[in-house]
Structures are given as C-alpha cells and as structure tokens.
Swiss-Prot record:
This is Photosystem II reaction center protein I. The keyword Cell wall biogenesis/degradation does not apply. It is found in: Plastid, Chloroplast thylakoid membrane. The chain crosses the membrane at residues 4-24. The gene is psbI. It comes from the Eukaryota. It is a single-pass membrane protein. One of the components of the core complex of photosystem II (PSII), required for its stability and/or assembly. PSII is a light-driven water:plastoquinone oxidoreductase that uses light energy to abstract electrons from H(2)O, generating O(2) and a proton gradient subsequently used for ATP formation. It consists of a core antenna complex that captures photons, and an electron transfer chain that converts photonic excitation into a charge separation. Coiled coil: none annotated.
Amino acid sequence: MFTLKIFVYTTVIFFISLFVFGFLSNDPSRNPNRKDLE
C-alpha cells in the first residue's frame, strides 16, 4: 500500500510538472520544437 501511494504521488507530480512546463513554454518563439515534446 505504501508503494502504491508513492507511485500515485509520483504520477501526480509528474503531470503537474508537465502542465507547468507546457504553460511556461507556451510561446512558440521561445520553444519552436514544442511539437516534438508532445
């Protein structure tokens, strides 16, 4: 059960990081290769 909780927390943090990264690099002029990351 403890391992499952760690896995869930890691997944949540991972998706939040992706959301924040996508929001900060939403400007195509700063990050023209954004399509390659999706």
